[in-house]
């Protein structure tokens, strides 16, 4: 009967189970489709959010960079160093304006003195023509004794004039050397200036490369931070989902444990009941050995009755099927829990690996930032030193160029005032009539020749005045270019340097000649010595020396 009942009752649960499986599969497909759609929508929303966050980060960083630049510019403009520099420039400009007024007054006085000298030269030329006529008339009537005396006087005066002429030549030679030194120093400073310009360009190129590298590193850092944020969000979501699943599984596991404990209690009750039945059967077997078959059947009936009591509707097949289904569900849940545990372990490993990568990236980023900062500091220090050197050399170059320009202008004015002839210089190829570095020595040679001619004319005039009819004792020779004979010194053995009428090549002597700068005081001394007497020489020298001393003290204090 049991076999027949099982055969009859088996097809109905198979159909219901298949229908359930089909319904479950259909619902599972729907859920998978919904899950895929939700995953795709979440991915697209995450991608859009990441792009939006990255763009916002870039805009924030750009605004921060602009704010830093503006604050830096404001701090530089309002820094006490720049304010002190402006004050120093103002004081220097005021001092230069004051010196400009002094020099303009000196130039006006020199112009007046040169005009007076021109008038005197014209008068002297007229007197010389008159004296020549008188000399031709009175030459035959001169006494030989007086001639001897005059010859002796003129020889002494000529000796004194030659001494002064030699000193003039030595001073001119020294000035030529100073001019050559200035030209050589100018060439050397030009060479150094070009080298510093090249170094400055290379430093700027290296700075641009370093800035590009730093920007690339910063962009990589921003990308890594965005990835880290996305991974953290994903990790938080996975952890929350995992916690929910774990809670659900724990709830199911507790329910299954309760069910198993209930089944075990039921089975224990059944085993106790079976033990009692076995004992009774053993007693019955001992007593009644012949009735074993009937008793075994009775025991089966007792077990069957107990199972019917355990079953709800009295269906033993349903009870066994429920028990097997529960066991299968428990086994499936157990396998699902093990898979979840494995997934959790893999997720923990992945999160640990990601955290290690994040730590490594942070350490690499920090080391790269420190390296770029050190490189930028070194480059800034080198740039500061090079800019200081370039400023120093530029200031020196400006001073030397101002000195040379002032010297050229003064030589040109003196050349025009004493009516020198520049046909020898203009006859050369490439000359335009302007004073340059190459033809400056030629102009000096022509000026020196003209001064020698003027000195000879003055000596001849003195000779004619000394030969007057009523003059017994001649007046002492007074040189208009030296202020009087009171400053004359006894003759000393000096080496006479003849004037140079050509331009010397100095391109091969840049390293041999020591570099000395012709100061403003030396040029003013030379100007006043040639143009006026001893009183102007002394006062101008003292005044310019004091100004130069004050200027040097002020520059040292500012530097």
UniProtKB/Swiss-Prot annotation:
Coiled-coil residue windows: 14-70, 185-261, 364-414
A GO-annotated cellular component: axoneme
Pfam assignment, any one: ODAD1_CC
InterPro entries in UniProt: ODA-DC/CCD, ODAD1_CC
Source taxon at top rank: Eukaryota
Keywords: Coiled coil, Differentiation, Spermatogenesis
GO biological process per UniProt: cilium movement; outer dynein arm assembly; spermatid development
Job of this protein: Plays a role in spermiogenesis. Involved in the elongation of flagella and the formation of sperm heads.
Protein name: Coiled-coil domain-containing protein 63
Organism from which the protein derives: Rattus norvegicus
Gene label: Ccdc63
């Amino acid at each position: 009967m049991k076999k027949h009942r099982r055969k009859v009752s088996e097809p109905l649960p198979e159909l219901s189970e298949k229908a359930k499986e089909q319904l479950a599969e259909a619902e599972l497909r729907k859920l998978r489709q919904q899950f895929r759609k939700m995953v795709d929508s979440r991915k697209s929303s995450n991608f859009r959010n990441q792009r939006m966050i990255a763009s916002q980060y870039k805009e924030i960083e750009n605004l921060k960079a602009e704010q830093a630049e503006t604050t830096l510019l404001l701090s530089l403009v309002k820094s006490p160093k720049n304010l002190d520099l402006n004050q120093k420039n103002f004081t220097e400009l005021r001092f230069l304006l004051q010196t400009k007024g002094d020099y303009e007054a000196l130039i006006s006085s020199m112009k007046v003195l040169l005009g007076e000298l021109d008038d005197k030269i014209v008068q002297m030329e007229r007197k010389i023509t008159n004296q020549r006529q008188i000399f031709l008339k009175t030459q035959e009537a001169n006494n030989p004794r007086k001639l001897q005396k005059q010859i002796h006087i003129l020889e002494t005066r000529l000796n004194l004039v030659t001494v002064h002429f030699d000193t003039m030549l030595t001073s001119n030679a020294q000035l030529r050397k100073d001019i050559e030194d200035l030209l050589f120093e100018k060439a050397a400073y030009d060479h150094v200036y070009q080298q510093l310009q090249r170094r400055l360009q290379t430093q700027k190129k290296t700075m641009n490369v370093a800035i590009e590298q730093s920007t690339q590193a910063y962009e990589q850092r921003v990308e890594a931070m965005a990835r880290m944020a996305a991974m953290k969000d994903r990790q938080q979501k996975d952890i929350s989902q995992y916690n929910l699943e774990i809670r659900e599984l724990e709830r199911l596991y507790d329910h299954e444990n309760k069910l198993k404990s209930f089944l075990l209690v039921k089975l224990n009750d059944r085993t106790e009941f079976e033990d009692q039945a076995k004992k009774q059967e053993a007693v019955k077997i001992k007593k009644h050995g012949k009735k074993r078959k009937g008793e075994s059947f009775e025991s089966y009936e007792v077990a069957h009755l107990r199972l019917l009591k355990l079953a709800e509707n009295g269906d033993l097949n349903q009870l066994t099927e429920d028990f097997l289904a529960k066991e299968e569900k428990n086994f499936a849940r157990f396998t699902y829990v093990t898979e979840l545990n494995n997934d959790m372990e893999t997720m923990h490993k992945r999160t640990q690996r990601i955290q290690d990568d994040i730590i490594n990236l942070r350490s690499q980023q920090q080391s790269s930032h420190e390296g770029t900062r050190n490189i930028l500091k070194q480059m800034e220090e080198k740039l500061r030193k090079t800019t200081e050197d370039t400023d120093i050399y530029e200031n020196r170059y400006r001073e030397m160029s101002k000195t040379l320009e002032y010297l050229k202008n003064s030589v040109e004015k003196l050349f025009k005032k004493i009516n020198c002839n520049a046909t020898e210089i203009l006859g050369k190829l490439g000359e335009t009539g302007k004073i340059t570095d190459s033809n400056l020595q030629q102009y000096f040679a022509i000026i020196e020749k003209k001064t020698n001619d003027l000195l000879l004319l003055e000596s001849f005039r003195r000779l004619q005045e000394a030969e007057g009819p009523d003059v017994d004792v001649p007046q002492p020779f007074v040189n208009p270019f030296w202020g009087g004979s009171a400053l004359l010194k006894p003759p000393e053995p000096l080496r006479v340097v003849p004037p140079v009428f050509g331009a010397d090549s100095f391109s091969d002597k840049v390293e041999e000649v020591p570099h000395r700068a012709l100061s403003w005081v030396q040029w003013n001394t030379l100007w006043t010595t040639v143009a006026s007497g001893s009183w102007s020489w002394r006062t101008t020298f003292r005044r310019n020396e004091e100004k130069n001393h004050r200027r040097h003290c002020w520059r040292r204090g500012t530097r």
